[in-house]
Amino acid sequence: MPFPFGKSHKSPADIVKNLKESMAVLEKQDISDKKAEKATEEVSKNLVAMKEILYGTNEKEPQTEAVAQLAQELYNSGLLGTLVADLQLIDFEGKKDVAQIFNNILRRQIGTRTPTVEYICTQQNILFMLLKGYESPEIALNCGIMLRECIRHEPLAKIILWSEQFYDFFRYVEMSTFDIASDAFATFKDLLTRHKLLSAEFLEQHYDRFFSEYEKLLHSENYVTKRQSLKLLGELLLDRHNFTIMTKYISKPENLKLMMNLLRDKSRNIQFEAFHVFKVFVANPNKTQPILDILLKNQTKLIEFLSKFQNDRTEDEQFNDEKTYLVKQIRDLKRAAQQEA
């Protein structure tokens, strides 16, 4: 009878046990270089063996029974959490292996069940350790890869959104290291757009706190953060699931004033993204009085400004149609005001 675990002849239980022991050695501060080197080697070897069980090799496909055993061993031993907690102690290639193992195990399904998602729901600290990974440059991008895989699953996205730690994203997207800030923004955007109903519920329940933090991003000194935040704001407001949030946002005069200022930003790209938020205020058929007052007060200036706004975008038909429509809407405001008078 052929041995089910291939060339290595190591069962999933052995691999997990060896890996856990080697990680425990690396966790000790006072070990000799020789011991650390040996433990690092063992960690690498066992991570590769684990990957072979999950992904198979050129010669053979992954075996369901071995994968199931490995997953169970990872849950029972707590090793999944240990690998995340000690990610900094693992070498460069090993960090990539951990992310691949984690994401593979996370995607695993039995019928309609996703056992690893259920497991992480009971071990929520794993999510928060991944999130905190953005504070450590050497593991930030690995943690981002695992975090986004978690967010694909609604129960895990909900845990993060409703946590206090979610608000750490407002710091992470402003980090000075471009790669890390961009990665954090990609994760932040995923959280707010992947599960539409969940995001809408979150934004409705936490509107004031979320948007007071979000406004700081729109004032950011960092061009990329400012532009990405403005673009995402436009997407959030125009998503039909967020109708209640959009209605509330475009009823506030301070938000309109901010967009009018951003229309005159020194960056053309920022101006362009601001235009896509500004148009929602103008196109709204049920404008609040404070919004109407601002538009009427600046009516002539706005018509003149929009008529000349980025006129070199001749190829962009939709933009030009929208601009023409906004000019007409703003021009017609006067008539509406006069008729009422």
UniProtKB/Swiss-Prot annotation:
Native organism: Mus musculus
Domain of life: Eukaryota
Assigned GO CC terms: cytoplasm; serine/threonine protein kinase complex
GO molecular function, one term: protein serine/threonine kinase binding
Family under the similarity heading: Belongs to the Mo25 family.
Xref: SUPFAM superfamilies: ARM repeat
GO biological process: cellular hypotonic response; intracellular signal transduction; negative regulation of potassium ion transmembrane transport
Listed name of the protein: Calcium-binding protein 39
Alphabetized UniProt keyword annotations: Cytoplasm
Oligomeric form and interacting partners: Component of a trimeric complex composed of STK11/LKB1, STRAD (STRADA or STRADB) and CAB39/MO25 (CAB39/MO25alpha or CAB39L/MO25beta): the complex tethers STK11/LKB1 in the cytoplasm and stimulates its catalytic activity.
Cellular compartment(s): Cytoplasm
InterPro entries for the chain: ARM-like, ARM-type_fold, Mo25
Reported function: Component of a complex that binds and activates STK11/LKB1. In the complex, required to stabilize the interaction between CAB39/MO25 (CAB39/MO25alpha or CAB39L/MO25beta) and STK11/LKB1.
